[in-house]
Amino acid sequence: MTKLTKRMRNIREKVEVTKDYEINEAIALLKELATANFNESVDVAVNLGIDARKSDQNVRGATVLPHGTGRNVRVAVFTQGANAEAAKEAGADLVGMEDLAELVKKGEMNFDVVVASPDAMRVVGQLGTILGPRGLMPNPKVGTVTPNVAQAVKNAKAGQVRYRNDKNGIIHTTIGKVDFDGAQLKENLESLLVALKKAKPTSAKGVFLKKVSISTTMGAGVSLDQSTLETTTK
């Protein structure tokens, strides 16, 4: 029989697996149980009321969290001319066209997000087999293929998260770090849930946000009482 670590025993003792926690109580509990020797991420899993087998019910998009993610995001931009200068001024870490593509082909990918202007897709399209499996391929649905590359760079730097349901209809993403204060994590989560509700497919029927759980990188996962969250869409 596998011996439980001290951390796992602590989690089992303090987390009620059948309970839906009030949001502030849940955040306080996660912080208490986050004992790793690094600043853990706070992640969220949202079970959606969709049939993921149907393409018209899949949910994909991006939203900027009000308090960011706590990550230092490096952004590469494929563009040229005036757009290249605008991207640099917006804080892009790498900007180019064929020269940037050559770096990617060599495996030099020191970036977390790729943005491209529409005219650059002829170059980026050749990198699909490299960028695609890493989740880096630019896509207009998440705002990374756009004429306004400067704004896309600013969004990425400001804490934009991308979301896409998996085959089980679940969204997995991050809402910050353990060292964020409780109000910041709550507001980030509520902002994400509002964005998801706005992205609800018209063909999806019934309850859309079926279950919301938050967890830390190395710690506990707790289910939330959604009535304690403000997710009214305007």
Swiss-Prot record:
InterPro entries: Ribosom_uL1_bac-type, Ribosomal_uL1, Ribosomal_uL1-like, Ribosomal_uL1/biogenesis, Ribosomal_uL1_3-a/b-sand, Ribosomal_uL1_CS. GO terms for biological process: regulation of translation; translation. The keyword Hydrolase does not apply. Keywords: Repressor, Ribonucleoprotein, Ribosomal protein, RNA-binding, rRNA-binding, Translation regulation, tRNA-binding. One of its GO terms (molecular function) is rRNA binding. It comes from the Bacteria. It holds the Pfam family Ribosomal_L1. PROSITE patterns: RIBOSOMAL_L1. GO terms for cellular component: cytosolic large ribosomal subunit. Gene3D superfamilies: 3.30.190.20, 3.40.50.790. Belongs to the universal ribosomal protein uL1 family. PANTHER family: 54S RIBOSOMAL PROTEIN L1, MITOCHONDRIAL (PTHR36427), LARGE RIBOSOMAL SUBUNIT PROTEIN UL1M (PTHR36427:SF3). Part of the 50S ribosomal subunit. Binds directly to 23S rRNA. The L1 stalk is quite mobile in the ribosome, and is involved in E site tRNA release. Protein L1 is also a translational repressor protein, it controls the translation of the L11 operon by binding to its mRNA. This is Large ribosomal subunit protein uL1. It comes from Aliivibrio salmonicida (strain LFI1238) (Vibrio salmonicida (strain LFI1238)).
